[in-house]
A protein has these predicted regions:
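Structured, basic alpha/beta domains of bacterial-type, RNA-associated proteins
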Residues: 2-25, 29, 36, 40, ...
Length: 146
């Protein structure tokens, strides 16, 4: 590997250490229905989002709750020795994209057939820490003031 690629790979590795991401692929619900729950929890603190997902009756709520718990576990692995409550975790980004569609045929009157699209989706959830962002902004302000 060339030196330029090696440097870029090292920079990429360092940036991945500070990202806390969980992915859910091929979730068998329609993206539109999942986006309703994703929009409800976007930008909220982790504890508040868990409460909303736990008591919601929507089909995608338990899956998103499990995904959020997975992202929290990823944060815990990368930050051993830190307390989750002190870091003020929140949902920085949640993205629901369309996945693979299963196309089925449903019989219709007069010898016709209607196409049924069974949709799926992919969900990407990223956590952020309000404490880390506050310290980063104060450090950047200190550098600008000098």
């Amino acid at each position: 590997m060339g030196s330029r690629k090696h440097k870029c790979a090292e920079i990429y590795k360092e940036s991945r250490k500070s990202r806390y991401v969980a992915r859910l692929n091929n979730n068998p619900t329609s993206p539109r229905k999942t986006r309703l729950m994703a929009n409800a929890i976007r930008g909220l603190d982790v504890d508040k989002a868990l409460g909303i997902l736990q008591y919601s009756h929507r089909e995608s709520a338990p899956k998103l709750r499990k995904l959020l718990l997975s992202a929290m576990a990823n944060w815990q692995v990368k930050n051993t020795g830190k307390v989750m409550e002190e870091s003020e975790l929140y949902i920085k980004m949640i993205c629901v994209n369309g996945g693979r569609q299963l196309k089925r045929l449903r019989t219709a009157p007069q010898g016709r057939g209607y196409r049924v699209r069974k949709r799926s989706n992919h969900v990407i959830l990223e956590l952020g820490s309000r404490v880390e962002e506050r310290t980063a902004t104060t450090e950047s302000n200190d550098v600008e003031n000098k």
